[in-house]
UniProtKB/Swiss-Prot annotation:
<keyword id="KW-0614">Plasmid</keyword>
<dbReference type="GO" id="GO:0007165">
    <property type="term" value="P:signal transduction"/>
</dbReference>
<dbReference type="InterPro" id="IPR001690">
    <property type="entry name" value="Autoind_synthase"/>
</dbReference>
<comment type="function">
    <text>Required for the synthesis of OHHL (N-(3-oxohexanoyl)-L-homoserine lactone), an autoinducer molecule which binds to TraR and thus acts in the control of conjugal transfer.</text>
</comment>
<dbReference type="GO" id="GO:0009372">
    <property type="term" value="P:quorum sensing"/>
</dbReference>
<keyword id="KW-0071">Autoinducer synthesis</keyword>
<dbReference type="Pfam" id="PF00765">
    <property type="entry name" value="Autoind_synth"/>
</dbReference>
<keyword id="KW-0808">Transferase</keyword>
<keyword id="KW-0673">Quorum sensing</keyword>
<keyword id="KW-0184">Conjugation</keyword>
<keyword id="KW-0949">S-adenosyl-L-methionine</keyword>
<dbReference type="InterPro" id="IPR016181">
    <property type="entry name" value="Acyl_CoA_acyltransferase"/>
</dbReference>
<dbReference type="GO" id="GO:0061579">
    <property type="term" value="F:N-acyl homoserine lactone synthase activity"/>
</dbReference>
<protein>
    <recommendedName>
        <fullName>Acyl-homoserine-lactone synthase</fullName>
        <ecNumber>2.3.1.184</ecNumber>
    </recommendedName>
</protein>
<dbReference type="InterPro" id="IPR018311">
    <property type="entry name" value="Autoind_synth_CS"/>
</dbReference>
<comment type="similarity">
    <text>Belongs to the autoinducer synthase family.</text>
</comment>
Length: 212
């Protein structure tokens, strides 16, 4: 299982992976979780996909997308502040240049690759490691997100607990919560599954191009 980063300049080249990503989001958020999301041509999209985010994808066998997340700098419009301000204790996000927002995180847990540490799916831990590694490589040390109580528990089990930015709020058919997470070496080492391949360096330790 490998991590692929797709920055705006790579959208066209990685279009087939992005189509898979949108289909995976439709399956997880629309069909499985029954969230109120917009699905068109089999894929889930929203207005934040129009803001040139970077996507983190977990791929299996070099072809199948089994995990994804969207990253946006909070200095611009973000899902947390514009769509879910009720999750923030102050109603607004005190953004810094060292902060990145992650949203639309999901994994295909039907993949028969077994469970990794703490009985979490390998795709989940691979995605966590990829998000933290990309964040550190691009100068971010804090990740903010809006999620639900179920996923908050998953983060804690992974050894990457979230600090809440407000109280949980019932939204639709779920209970949502906002929080921030550290993007540092200690967190990366806790979540990193065996066999993880760095997205920052090649096999000889040479740095690869930034995904930002």
């Amino acid at each position: 299982m490998l991590i692929l980063t797709v920055s705006p300049d790579q959208y066209q080249h990685q279009n087939s992976y992005l189509k898979q990503m949108h289909r995976l989001r439709a399956e997880v958020f629309g069909n499985r979780l029954k969230w109120d999301v917009a699905i068109e041509d089999g894929g889930e999209r929203d207005q934040y996909d129009e803001l040139s985010p970077t996507y983190i994808l977990a791929t299996f066998g070099g072809q199948r997308v089994v995990g994804c997340a969207r990253l946006l700098a909070p200095s611009g419009p973000t899902m947390l502040e514009r769509t879910f301000p009720q999750l923030l204790a102050t109603g607004s996000l005190s953004a810094t240049t060292a902060m990145i927002e992650t949203s639309r995180f999901c994994v295909d847990t039907t993949l028969p690759t077994g469970r990794a540490g703490r009985q979490l799916h390998l795709a989940t831990l691979t995605m966590f490691a990829g998000i933290i590694e990309w964040s550190m490589a691009n100068g971010y040390d804090e990740i903010v997100t809006a999620t639900d109580l179920r996923f908050e528990r998953i983060l804690k089990r992974a050894g990457w607990p979230m600090t809440r930015l407000g109280e949980p709020v019932a939204i639709g058919n779920t209970v949502a919560v906002a929080g921030h997470l550290p993007a540092d070496r200690k967190s990366f080492e806790r979540v990193c599954p065996p066999g993880y391949r760095s997205i920052i360096a090649d096999d000889n330790g040479r740095p690869l191009r930034s995904a930002a």
